[in-house]
Amino acid sequence: AVRKALLDAALAAPVLKKGLFRSPVILESIELLRQGSRFLCRVRSRDGAEGVSVAHSTMSRLYPLFLHNIQPFFLGKDARDLDQLLEKVFIYGFNFRYNGISLGIPLATLEFAILDLLGRMTGLPVTKLVGDLHHPQVEVYRATEFRELPLEEHFRRVKESLAEHEFTALKIKVGYLMYMTADLNAKEPVGKSERLIPMVREAYPQLTLYADANGYYDVAGAIRVGRILQENKFAYFEEPVMYDHFEDIKAVADALEMPVANGEQDQ
């Protein structure tokens, strides 16, 4: 109850520091610029301030939602009301029906452009617009795929990926690829992840390690693999079960001592 009260209070608190802006910042133009499969968002205020953001690669499929579901709502609005706008846009045009990545990526693209505009106006980094700077430097981890490959090839590709740059952390995929396959009954080779986990830890004792199952396991399977991750000192287990199966997520989290993370499509 205490933890929930703290979370509720944090959610109710304002995020953007509106006091930094004395007069309205009216969004006069919102553009989505395209070069091939790459997109930029550019916003301008009525007073000529400008902000730019780089869109996620999936904008090539989601740009109609940006143009029809998000852009019209924000045009003419005061950017100082960003907190409220990010909530009310879900009501506009029944946008809540597109919750998750479908709406989240176009919306985040515009949000970043607006924050860039406000940051340029004040000369402040975004961290100073929405809070305080806690970490002047952020470590970068190497995310890898390869879960559809046989064990030895998977492990080799992970090592090759790490050799490209100096990383202090690594994320591996466990479970099995549930997309990009026509086989409706595709299953992970028995014992593959169970063998991969200690192989990676033994090879990289100095690295911070993460594991992502992309929702492959049921509760029992996730707990079993999670305990192997714990034994090998992995820092967190991402999407052990389907991201919207909240009771299953809780069951896994309660059974493990390590942190359990949910995915980017969950809002």
Role assignments for model-derived ranges:
Residues 38, 63, 245-249:
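Short, well-ordered alpha-helical microsegments
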Residues 111-149:
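Glycine-rich, aromatic-flanked loop segments that form ligand/cofactor-binding clefts
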Residues 240-244, 262-267:
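A general structural motif
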